[in-house]
Amino acid sequence: MENRNLETLAQELGLKKQQVETVLELTAEGNTIPFIARYRKEKTGNLDETQIKAIIDMDKSLTALQDRKETVLAKIEAQGKLTDQLKAAIEAAEKLADVEELYLPYKEKRRTKATIAREAGLFPLARLILQNSPNLKAEAEKLTSEAFPTADKALAGAVDILVEAFSEDNSLRSWTYNEIWNNSDITSTLKDQSLDEKETFKIYYDFEDKVSKLQGYRTLALNRGEKLGVIKVAFKHNLEKMHRFYSARFKQKNDYIEEVINQSLKKKIIPAMERRIRSELTEAAEDGAIQLFSQNLRSLLLVSPLKGKMVLGFDPAFRTGAKLAVVDQTGKLITTQVIYPVAPASQAKIAQAKKDLADLIKKHAIEIIAIGNGTASRESEAFVAEVLKDFPETSYVIVNESGASVYSASELARHEFPDLTVEKRSAISIARRLQDPLAELVKIDPKSIGVGQYQHDVSQKKLSENLDFVVDTVVNQVGVNVNTASSTLLSHVSGLNKTISENIVAYREENGEITSRAEIKKVPRLGAKAFEQAAGFLRIPNAKNILDNTGVHPESYPAVKALFKQLAITDLDDSAKAKLKALNLKETAEGLGLGQETLKDIIADLLKPGRDLRDDFEAPVLRQDVLELKDLSVGQKLEGTVRNVVDFGAFVDIGVHEDGLIHISEMSKSFVNHPSQVVSVGDLVTVWVSKVDLEHEKLNLSLVNPRESN
C-alpha cells in the first residue's frame, strides 16, 4: 500500500521520494539503520544513519498526526457538525496542537459553569447580551431558576456561556498565539534567594527577553529555576492591543460583553496560549539539548584509543585512600592496590604511598597513569606529578570519571570482577577508558557520562532513544572484535540483542576463539537475518580470510574473489594495493555486478584491513607536570582538550583543576552560530587565557589570538 507520507517526508527532509520509499521498505523488511547506511548505499542514494533515522522518526510522527486527524474528524462528524471548511482546516493542520485547537469546541467536556447555565435555559439570555438588549435585567428575571435564583446570577450564567464559546473560538486563539509568540516578552524575577546559595540563577533574578528570541539553554534554565522555587517566570503582553482586537469582534458593547472579553482574554485564552508556548519552547529546547548531548557523546566515543599501553588507573579519594588498578595492553587486570597519598593521611603514609606507586611503575613498566577527575583529583595529580619526576618515560592523563561509579556498582561490573570492591572496579574502568573509550563507555548509561547540558531536565525517554542511537551508530561504524568484545559492546552491533550477545561470549568460552565469520552462524539463536545484519560489523583480526577483519560484507566475498582473480592478487602487499588504487570504479563495479559506492567501500577496507575509524581522531593530551591556576596569565598560549560543548561555549581541559570556558563570542573573529560548528568533544585546541578569577576559581579562554583579535 502506498505510504501517504512519502511526498511530505521527501519535501520536509529535502530528499527524493524514491529514497524515502526505499528506506521505509528496507526498514519494514527488518533491516537496521547501520546495515542500511553501510550496505545498501546504492538503494538509498548514499543516505547516512542520521538521515535514515530522520525518515523513520518523521514517518512515525506523521502517521500519529494523520491517525489523530481521522479520529477527530470522525468524532465531529458523528455530532453532525463537520463542515467542509472545518474538515479542510483539520486536514491542513501541520501540528498535533493545531488539530486539538480545532477540535476544542467539539470535545466532550466535564461539566462546566457554562454547561450548567445552558442546562438551565440561559442560552437565549446570552444571545440577548450579544444583541445589547435594553431590558437585560427584566429578561434575566424571567429565566431565574433553582440554580440561578436571581437576575444577576442568571446574567452571570449567560456570561459564562459566552466566555466558553468565545474562548474556544479558533481564530481568536490562533491570533493570540501568534501575537504572544511574535511580540510578547518572557520575564523572570527573584522569588527566594535562600534556595540559590551559589547564585546559579543570578542572571535570571531580573530577566527579560523576546519569546521569539529565547535561546534553548535559557528556556531550560528558567524551567529549572522555577521548579526549584528560586525564580518566578511570567509573560509580558501588550494587553491593550489584545483587548482592541477582541473588542472588534463585537458590533455593540455593554458591561457584560466587556466582562466576556476580559474573562476570555485573561482567564482562558492567554493562560492556555502561554502554556502551549512554554511547552513548545521546552520541547524545542529539549530537542536542542538532546542533539548537543548526542554530538558530544559521539565525539567522546570516537576519541582515539591508546592501544598497546600498560596503564595504571588511579581513583582518587581523601579519607578512604586512592584505589589503583594496573591493566595490561589488552585491558586485562593485573593487580590492584590502595594507597594514602593525600591529607588527612600522615606524612609516613604519604611517603609509603610514593614508594608503592613507584614500585608499581617499575614492576609493571607503566606507561600512562589515568587519574579520575572526581574528589581529591587535584591533590592526587600533584602527588603523581611528584612521583613521575623520577620516571620520565611515564605520563599521566586526567580522565573524566563520570559514570564510573555507576558502572562499578552495576550487575555487569559485579559479574566481571566479583571479588573486588566498587572503588577498585572504578579504578579499572578509569584505566580502560583511556585504552579503549568506546568499549568501556558502552557499559555505562550514556546519561551518566556527563557531556551535555540540562540532561536531567529533558524527556528521559527521548534522551535515551537518541543516545542509544548514537552508541549503536558509533559501535557499528568502528566495528567490533568478536573475540574480545564484552556482551554489552556486542549488544550494540546491528542485528544482535542481549541474548545473542551473551550467547556469543558463552560460545567463545566453550569453544575458544571464533576463527571465521562463517563460524558465527554456529552461535545459538543467531539466525540468518541476524547474521546478515551483523556480519559486516564483526571483526576477526587473526582470521584465515583477511576479509573477515574488514567492513566487507560476506555477501560481497564472491565479487572480491573475482576482483582478486582479475587483478592477479594473492596477498594484500604494496603491489596489490597499487592495483586497487588504479582501478576504474565505474567499469570495475559494472563488471563485478556491484554498485560504485559498495566497491569504493570495499577498496577502502582492502587498502587498510582492520583499520580503526578512531585512529583519525585526537588522542588525549599526556602530561607530566601540574599547572596551577595561579601560574596562568592573560594572553598566555596553551594546548587543551575540549571536555564539553554547550550552547553558549565549550569547556576545555588545559591541565589546571578547573576546565576553562571558551564563550561562543571568543571562538572566532567572525560570527559563530553555535559552538559545535567550531569544536567537538575530544578536540585538541590551541587557546589563549582571557581571564583568570582566582577567588572563584574560574578560567576564561579564547580561540582567538589576542594579537590578531583586532
What role is predicted for each listed range?
Residues 32, 44, 48-149, 477-616, ...:
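Accessory alpha-helical DNA-binding modules that contact the DNA backbone or grooves
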Residues 1-21, 28:
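Generic start-of-chain signal for non-secretory N-termini
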Residues 39-41, 238, 316, 329-330, ...:
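Short, ordered loop/turn segments at secondary-structure junctions
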Residues 100-104, 113-114, 118, 127-130, ...:
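S1/OB-fold single-stranded RNA-binding interface
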Residues 308-313, 323, 381-384, 516-519, ...:
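Short beta-alpha junctions and helix-cap segments that line functional grooves
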Residues 266-272, 396-481, 486, 536-624, ...:
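OB-fold/S1-family RNA-binding modules
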Residues 51-53, 61, 65-313, 317-419, ...:
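Duplex nucleic acid-engaging cores and interfaces of nucleic-acid transaction enzymes
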Residues 13-17, 27-31, 40-47, 59-69, ...:
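Conserved NTP-handling cores and scaffolds of large molecular machines
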